[in-house]
Amino acid sequence: MHISEINIYPIKSLKGISVESAVVEKRGLEFDRRWMLTDRGGMFFTQREFPRMALVSVWIEEGGIGAAADGFGEAFIPRLPEIRNRQPVTVWASNVEAEVHSPVLNEWFSDVLGTDCQLVYMPDDARRSVNARFDRGNEIVSFADGYPLMALSEASLADLNSRLDESLPMNRFRPNLVISGAEAFAEDDWKTVEIGGARFRSTKPCERCVITTIDQSAGEFDGKEPLRTLAQYRMAKDVMPDRLERLGVGENAVLFGQNLIAESVGATISVGDSVNAIEVYETNFVPVSSS
């Protein structure tokens, strides 16, 4: 197995960036989801409510990042705001302190989304813990939904696409790491995995939501797939019934991909790096064959 693609998403729920290598930090890959759009009260925005967020491009520049949207031009976003304005923000059930960016940037993003919003940045001293079930005392995460990284294999997507009338691209699932050379759903059973010179441990498989039904190139919802098909063979009660209580996964959760926590902070991983499963769960699950 090896890494075939590395993706980072500097601003939560905006378009991702494919990179050749990335530095592994405690809270995830460098730059990944360190910025986020919220309402003025600090509640997070995602494509679930604003699917057109998928159309905003982001890139890395010296001293910060850039963003662009058709019809709205470009914006430069410094890593830290020039005027410091710290505010608590909310991602699901967790709260964390963040720096609010300038009124000019907030107005630009408000125009792009067609709703009042603000851009915030997670500073280095902010601490947002992962789910307590998987926290060994010092595990933190960026503005990602719950865990520092998510990996998905090409074979798992190929298996799904074999069941769909129209194949879907990998960007529907927004993984950080795409794995080539694995069997379909091999990532389900990872406990510990080594990538290049870095080691990661799994938390629980990724529970999929309606964002997977958004056409990332159009910024629009596109029917009920792939959730409808995934629900036929990837519900937790069917995939790993013996692990539900331990992992804290609901029996009807739709699973696709694996969440990871880094144990090798400071390492650099690159496209082409080998991927070795050091420790795996024993499983009796056999993927449902395509009809």
What do the PLM-derived regions correspond to, one by one?
Residues 1-291:
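Metal-cofactor-dependent catalytic cores
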